[in-house]
Amino acid sequence: HIRNLKYHKEYREVFSQLYENLREQKPDYIIHCGDIAHTKTQISPEYVQMCSDFLKNLADIAPTYVILGNHDGNLRNSSRQDALTPIANALQHENLYLLRDAGETLLNGHFSLNVLSVFDEDNWVDPSDPNRINIALYHGSISNCETDLGWRMERGENDISIFNNFDYG
């Protein structure tokens, strides 16, 4: 959650460490599953700069795939623009992929990303090829899941069965 006006010095420090670690690890891909923005409808110039730098730096390291989280867009007003699309479009980075809608994206001949978008549930699809490694990307709550600290999510938006046809989720 990049806030509009707070913690930008801290974000820069943490992001700098993240970029350094990623460069050392040399990932094939970077996947971010939502909530880059803290507020979806009131965006500051400071947020735009921080988000732009964040996405550009990730995409400079490896192909970067991003889905929207509930804080990145307005679930109650689908006519409003999300907080990431204008930034991703302006960057025009060849390694930055904003996967806004539900659907399947092939990474190479072996992997498939399936976006289960909270903004596009009507268009969720199952993997098209069970021989690929199929990875579900989702940003939402799952009923009856339990954290490492023992807290249980009683009422989520979906249950764990949404991942049944995927190898990873």
Language model segments and positions:
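Conserved acidic residues
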Residues: D28-I30, R132-N134, D167
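Core catalytic region of metal-dependent phosphoesterases/phosphodiesterases
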Residues: R3-E104
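Contiguous mid-protein beta-loop-alpha structural module that forms a pocket-lining wall or clamp
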Residues: F163-G169
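Conserved catalytic scaffold of divalent metal-dependent phosphoesterases
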Residues: D72, R76-I162
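Short, basic, glycine/proline-bearing loop/turn elements
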Residues: I2-L5, A37-K40, H139-L149
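Structural preference for beta-strand elements that scaffold enzyme active sites
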Residues: P63-Y65, I135-L137, Y168
